[in-house]
Amino acid sequence: MKPSGIGGQAVLEGIMMKNKSQYSVAVRRPDGEIEVKTDEYVGIAGDKAWAKLPLIRGMVNFIDSMILGMKTLSWSASFYEDEEEEAKPGKFEKFLLKLFGEKAEKVVMGATVAFSVIMAVLIFMLLPYFLSGLFRKFIVSNTLLAIVEGCIRMGIFILYVALISSMKDIRRTYMYHGAEHKCINCIERGRALSVRNVRKSSRYHARCGTSFLFIVMVISIIFFIFIRVESPVARVIVRVLLVPVIAGVAYEFIRLAGRSNNIVMRILSLPGKGMQMLTTKEPDDDMIEVAIAAVEAVFDWRAFQGLKEEEPLDMPKLESGQTDVPEPEELDEIKIEDL
């Protein structure tokens, strides 16, 4: 499997795809038509060399993905807002426009991302620490306490994902998430990008954000087993300060998993892919069409696969010496070749 380097995320009734600094958003409008927007996003650090260093690039990319995600989600939601609500800005919006002028949108975006990061740290890093403290009377070993803390952290994360997946709107978003993964898998496995080929591709992918967050949880257990401080206040501070480091390590793991095809990385990636059973669902053909439109707006998959324009879309690309068309993959289970 050849890595394409593209990635994306689901938005409201659509998909965002990013290829280097170029990104596209494809949305299924209420009238049934597909609206596609393309633009450039250079990132918070631009082309600075330090932002590309191992560990540092993980946190930078995480923040960039949140900013771009908020921006594209807002754009997709605009197609489903009431005309009256869209036409009349509220008092708070008027206040921000008066205070910050043209930079108001960027200020709101930055504040939203900052608030999201703070809430994530509180819920997934500090809350498990305080809850694990309830076991200090019964558990003397700091190693066991760190493991208990990690288990609580993963439990909160899994419960959160499971709860929101039961919401109707979120379920449709997860279906678009599945369509995004299917398109990338279709391309990277050498198949022409068509509805038929995308439909039979796997909805699980090693470079998924769900896998990244799960790996963050696992790595945090390892870190807190070996990094110990006596003061309770210092423990809280250490957990906050280590968030960028843990995120950086998790990013490097996901990056390696996305580029490597050896059995060890496949096995290590399995738990994260298992989490994708909650955050991805099988899309319908309309959703797949939206995903294809998003991909083709920023990525030349034909050039990537070395295909000619006249080659038929629905014929899978055969490997050298292969004469039979491969059987379709199973849709609802994770197979070894999907790892």
Predicted regions and their residues:
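Select subsegments of transmembrane alpha-helices in polytopic membrane proteins
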Residues: 108-124, 205-216
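Juxtamembrane "helix exit" motif at the C-terminal ends of alpha-helical transmembrane segments
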Residues: 75-79, 116-141, 216-240, 244-247, ...
